[in-house]
């Protein structure tokens, strides 16, 4: 099996750090959030451990223009999560993690709008599995592309936060950030 080379970088955003993994063409494969770079790197390596043909390399020096563009767009999205849906059209991505069902859940979440939340049970019903809200919750927990797949928008039926792979305080912050009115960004013109 041929090796697939992926690049990773840790970027700073105002409230945390993000570890981003792309291919050499800038397609997003993975994103994780947290305050400790060393923990982000260890977690990434564990998450990729089953993919023996994926070779993870840190970006040293300046990244190529495609990778740099993805990193910058992710940073903008992280600073203002109301831009997530816009970035779905601007950042190329590839799901390598997850089962077919998990990917269906993630795609459904990618169709939610900023400042909207959805409950696990409603998502399960939408997928034709009305009694599988826990399965949907587990799929959210298995998401490996933070923010881009907006699992922070998924809540319990009562509107409570039941968990978040990157921590409940971060989920609360993201939901709060999405409640602010969106202002047009001239730098976000579609390409």
UniProtKB/Swiss-Prot annotation:
This enzyme catalyzes only one turnover and therefore is not strictly catalytic. According to one definition, an enzyme is a biocatalyst that acts repeatedly and over many reaction cycles. NCBIfam families: ogt. Its EC number is 2.1.1.63. The active site is at residue 151. The gene is MGT1. It holds the Pfam family DNA_binding_1. Gene3D superfamilies: Winged helix-like DNA-binding domain superfamily/Winged helix DNA-binding domain. InterPro entries: MethylDNA_cys_MeTrfase_DNA-bd (IPR014048), MethylDNA_cys_MeTrfase_DNAb (IPR036217), WH-like_DNA-bd_sf (IPR036388). Its main location: nucleus. It catalyses: a 6-O-methyl-2'-deoxyguanosine in DNA + L-cysteinyl-[protein] = S-methyl-L-cysteinyl-[protein] + a 2'-deoxyguanosine in DNA; a 4-O-methyl-thymidine in DNA + L-cysteinyl-[protein] = a thymidine in DNA + S-methyl-L-cysteinyl-[protein]. This is Methylated-DNA--protein-cysteine methyltransferase. Keywords: DNA damage, DNA repair, DNA-binding, Methyltransferase, Nucleus, Transferase. DNA binds at residues 120, 134. It comes from Debaryomyces hansenii (strain ATCC 36239 / CBS 767 / BCRC 21394 / JCM 1990 / NBRC 0083 / IGC 2968) (Yeast). Belongs to the MGMT family.
């Amino acid at each position: 099996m041929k090796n697939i080379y992926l690049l990773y970088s840790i970027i700073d955003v105002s409230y945390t750090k993000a570890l981003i993994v792309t291919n050499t063409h800038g397609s997003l494969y993975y994103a994780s959030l947290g305050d400790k770079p060393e923990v982000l790197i260890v977690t990434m390596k564990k998450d990729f451990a089953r993919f023996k043909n994926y070779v993870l390399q840190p970006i040293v020096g300046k990244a190529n223009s495609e990778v740099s563009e993805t990193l910058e767009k992710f940073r903008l999205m992280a600073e203002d999560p109301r831009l997530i849906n816009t970035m779905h059209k601007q950042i190329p991505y590839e799901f390598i993690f997850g089962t077919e069902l998990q990917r269906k859940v993630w795609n459904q979440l990618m169709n939610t709008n900023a400042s909207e939340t959805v409950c696990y049970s409603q998502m399960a019903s939408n997928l034709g599995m009305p009694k599988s809200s826990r399965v949907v919750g587990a799929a959210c927990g298995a998401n490996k592309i933070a923010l881009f797949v907006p699992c922070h928008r998924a809540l319990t039926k009562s509107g409570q936060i039941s968990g978040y792979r990157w921590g409940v305080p971060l989920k609360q912050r993201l939901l709060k950030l999405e409640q602010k009115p969106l202002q047009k960004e001239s730098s976000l013109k579609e390409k």
